[in-house]
């Protein structure tokens, strides 16, 4: 079967493209906002209950009932009885709350692979293993945890990141399969009306808002037969075999795309997003920019438009460029006429960009260069408009 592309495996847009569904979402928005606030209050009580009660069948049933009030419905089916002696549960990854949902129906815990240890990690329901600096340290900590008697099974997500679950699974990482020779696979599907279940690149806080905003989200868990390692089977081959079993249960393709490929694709797509279109420039703004361009031909129009957007004044913009308040990459000025006399050559010639070739240009001080640039701009302004604003008032005051 042909391997699907990463784009088809990820959810990149949250809102529906169907106009009818979009209208329904807009009509539902006020009710959803009220529902979010109510569920946020109830969710605080659910969190307190999960903290106070010990892990037991009664606690899991109570949390499932309270979670249904939050709009999270969990159903599970077994192809055969679950072998509860297994210490490793393997599942595909759909949302940021998969570990919390599955723990409602089975005693298990999921290690904090990407979440920093602390209160937030504990509050999200992850198993804290201390500060982990490398994958080797993580595996050593998990092996130590599994060696302790009476511990809950580990729920691991070999995909290491979420997909939309419609076309394919990310390549299973091999490190979870090095922890045990027997694993218990399960497949997870998630459904939700109106909007996408999870959008790539969004934080868990954003996903929590939409989880409480939407009327309901249905999680369906399917227990699959336990899988044992074959003689002389490597961790990589073991992972590929379990990936095939889970993908067949979901009706999708087991791909070779890794979590690193997914992260790179999301990053690249984010950089390639088109910039928002700017508002069309008014005729007055264009005329003002042209005046500045005639006085300072070496300044690019993009820099002129940008500064005029802040100042709204031709004289102020010219002053900003002359005094160096606005940085820009100068354009090459085209020569339109013969060179002027030697008396005006020092003022009229454009300043060299970069390292000057003539010795006299290299010995010019910064103040001299600014004065030359100012005189050149003033002369061109006088030739174009007849007078420089502000000088007429000074002459009138002297008279």
UniProtKB/Swiss-Prot annotation:
Keyword Endoplasmic reticulum: yes
Native source species: Xenopus laevis
SMART domains assigned: CUE (SM00546), PlsC (SM00563)
MF (Gene Ontology): acyltransferase activity; ubiquitin binding
UniProt subcellular location: Endoplasmic reticulum membrane; Lipid droplet
GO biological process, one term: lipid droplet organization
Full protein name: Lipid droplet-regulating VLDL assembly factor AUP1
Known function: Plays a role in the translocation of terminally misfolded proteins from the endoplasmic reticulum lumen to the cytoplasm and their degradation by the proteasome. Plays a role in lipid droplet formation. Induces lipid droplet clustering.
Family stated for the protein in its record: Belongs to the AUP1 family.
Origin superkingdom: Eukaryota
Membrane-related topology note: Peripheral membrane protein
GO CC, alphabetical: endoplasmic reticulum membrane; lipid droplet
UniProt xrefs under Pfam families: CUE (PF02845)
Domain CUE: 284-326
UniProt KW keywords: Endoplasmic reticulum, Lipid droplet, Membrane
């Amino acid at each position: 079967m042909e391997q699907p592309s990463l784009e088809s495996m990820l959810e990149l847009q949250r809102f529906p493209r169907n106009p009818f569904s979009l209208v329904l979402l807009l009509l539902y928005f006020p009710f959803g906002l009220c529902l979010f606030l109510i569920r946020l209050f109830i969710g605080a009580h659910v969190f307190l209950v999960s903290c106070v009660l010990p892990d037991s069948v009664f606690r899991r049933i109570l949390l499932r009932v309270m979670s249904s009030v939050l709009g999270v419905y969990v159903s599970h089916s077994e192809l055969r009885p679950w072998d509860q002696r297994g210490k490793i549960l393997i599942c595909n990854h759909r949302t940021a709350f998969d570990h919390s949902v599955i723990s409602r129906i089975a005693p298990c815990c999921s290690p904090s692979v990407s979440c920093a240890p602390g209160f937030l990690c504990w509050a999200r329901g992850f198993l804290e293993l201390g500060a982990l600096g490398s994958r080797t340290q993580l595996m050593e900590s998990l092996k130590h945890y599994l060696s302790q008697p009476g511990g809950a099974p580990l729920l691991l997500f070999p995909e290491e990141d979420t997909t939309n679950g419609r076309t394919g699974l990310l390549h299973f990482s091999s490190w979870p399969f090095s922890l045990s020779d027997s694993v218990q696979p399960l497949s997870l599907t998630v459904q939700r009306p109106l909007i996408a279940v999870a959008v790539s690149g969004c934080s868990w806080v954003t996903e929590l808002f939409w989880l409480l905003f939407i009327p309901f989200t249905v999680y369906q868990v399917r227990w699959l037969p336990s899988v044992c390692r074959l003689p002389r089977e490597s961790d990589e081959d073991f992972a590929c075999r379990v990936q095939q079993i889970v993908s067949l249960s979901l009706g999708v393709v087991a791909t070779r795309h890794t979590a690193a490929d997914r992260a790179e694709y999301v990053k690249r797509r984010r950089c390639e997003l088109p910039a928002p279109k700017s508002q069309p420039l008014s005729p007055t703004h264009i005329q003002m920019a042209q005046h500045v361009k005639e006085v300072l031909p070496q300044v690019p129009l993009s820099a002129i438009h940008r500064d005029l957007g802040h100042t709204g004044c031709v004289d102020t913009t010219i002053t900003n460029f002359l005094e160096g308040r606005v940085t820009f990459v100068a354009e090459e000025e085209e020569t339109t006429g013969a060179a002027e006399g030697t008396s005006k050559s020092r003022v009229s010639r454009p300043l060299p960009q970069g390292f000057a070739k003539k010795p006299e240009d290299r010995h010019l001080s910064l103040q001299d260069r600014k004065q030359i640039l100012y005189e050149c701009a003033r002369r061109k302004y006088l030739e174009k408009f007849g007078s420089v604003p502000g000088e007429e008032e000074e002459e009138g005051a002297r008279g």
